[in-house]
Regions:
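Periplasmic/cell-envelope proteins involved in peptidoglycan metabolism and beta-lactam response
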Residues: 1-212, 222, 231, 256, ...
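Beta-lactam-recognizing serine transpeptidase/beta-lactamase-like catalytic domain environment
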Residues: 2-5, 9-16, 89, 149, ...
Length: 420
């Protein structure tokens, strides 16, 4: 009996000890929870930092270094002779000449003709000289030559930038613009390749120091690239958007008819056609073909101005453009709340609407490419000094702007211009 009681006491004692141990363990576990949370949090942060570091090294580092605002690029010039800028058809547009004393001079063989597109590389930078500076100051020359140059204290040859620019098209556009101020932009709709970009007044990049000195206080500097930064009323080119909006709001648009008398009053505003020419009875197709101002002002009084505003937004008015160079945003302000007297002028591309030649070319390209806008670009590829391709720039779609059916309809209407 005594033995049994002793056994029970031992069991109770053991159970009591086990219970206390369990309670102690539970208390310790509760104390350890914050420590574990902090540990996992630190591990999570560490993993995140490693992922970010790997991403930067593999993906972002080159683009950051290539950024035109990165001043570290200038350090490359100490060991690399800046490469050439070459047209798509093989014409050298910019190169570095070195004299017997090792002095380097950036030379532009065609001076004014490519001034704004190619830019300059002295007293600052502009154009391709700025955008592609990193590539031009990077060398992928044969490794044996680079070792030899390092041992003999000579510079490596920089890579060459092959552009999308076409010499013949650029020359044609440059000569066609003549002595007029303005700009010409030619883009390949299916790819976004900029084939020509001319701006006037122009300048000689070989004489950039004197040009900057002479134009420092000018309100209309020849250094301004009017193709990307010049703001102009779109004029009759805007009638394409007015036409498209009318078609959207009027499925029976083919039955449209208007009697043009050469001038008219719309929303208390007097509008007249060019030279007050009387076009007579015109359809929608005729209105676009003859660029009939009175017919379009008549159309404008019937349109939903908010819908037209949205259409303009779809074509990137008031928005950022998918373009790497400097540019100004175009402006369109007309809504249903705007003074109605502005409608007749707005729908024919006058009034307060402003657009850059580059942007206007993009609008036309989207229509010509079945409603899809391709991002405009001017660098086709990077080659080393031996002609081997180092980097290729591919075409890139911004996205669909209008439906393919709408693009087809507008293309057919625009073709009527050549049949009048």
């Amino acid at each position: 009996m005594k033995s049994k009681r002793s056994t029970n006491k031992a069991i109770m004692k053991k159970y009591s000890q086990g219970s206390r141990e369990a309670q102690e363990k539970q208390k310790n576990d509760k104390k350890n929870v914050p420590v574990l949370v902090i540990t996992y949090f630190v591990i999570f942060i560490f993993i995140g930092m490693m992922v970010h570091l790997v991403k930067y090294v593999v993906v972002d580092a080159d683009s950051d270094i290539a950024n035109s605002y990165n001043k570290r690029q200038n350090l490359y010039a100490e060991t690399v002779i800046k490469g050439q800028i070459i047209s798509d058809d093989g014409v050298v547009l910019a190169e570095t000449k070195t004299d017997d004393d090792g002095n380097e001079t950036r030379v532009y063989p065609y001076s004014n003709m490519f001034a704004h597109a190619v830019g300059y590389d002295s007293n600052g930078q502009a154009g391709l000289e700025m955008v592609s500076n990193y590539y031009l100051l990077t060398s992928n020359q044969n490794i044996l030559y680079r070792i030899y140059h390092a041992l003999s204290d000579k510079k490596d040859m920089g890579n060459n930038v092959i552009t999308t620019l076409d010499y013949d098209l650029q020359s044609t556009a440059y000569n066609a613009l003549g002595d007029n101020d303005g700009a010409v932009v030619a883009i390949e709709p299916s790819t976004g390749k900029i084939k020509a970009m001319v701006s006037k007044p122009d300048f000689d990049p070989n004489q950039i120091s004197s040009v900057i000195e002479e134009t420092a206080n000018s309100d209309s500097s020849c250094l301004l690239n009017r193709a990307t930064q010049g703001m102009y009323p779109p004029g009759s080119t805007f009638k394409i958007l007015t036409t498209l909006e009318y078609i959207r709001e009027n499925p029976n648009y083919k039955s449209y008819s208007y009697e043009c008398e050469g001038d008219g009053i719309f929303n208390s505003v007097s509008i007249h056609c060019y030279n007050h020419k009387v076009h007579g009875t015109v359809s929608l197709e005729d209105s676009l073909a003859y660029s009939c101002n009175t017919s379009f002002s008549n159309i404008g009084t019937k349109l939903d101005m908010d819908a037209l505003n949205k259409l303009c937004g779809d074509f990137l008015y008031n928005k950022e453009l998918p373009y790497d160079g400097y540019y100004k945003k175009s402006s369109y302000t007309m809504t249903s709340k705007t003074d109605k007297s502005l409608i007749p002028q707005t729908v024919i591309g006058q009034g307060e609407t402003l657009i850059t030649p580059l942007h206007n070319a993009m609008v036309m390209c989207a229509i010509a490419n079945g409603g899809v806008l391709m991002k405009p670009y001017m660098m086709d590829r990077i080659e080393n000094c031996d002609g081997s391709v180092v980097k290729k720039f591919s075409k890139d779609s911004y996205g669909r702007i209008i439906s393919s059916a709408e693009a087809q309809t507008m293309t057919e209407l625009m073709l009527s211009l050549i049949h009048i």
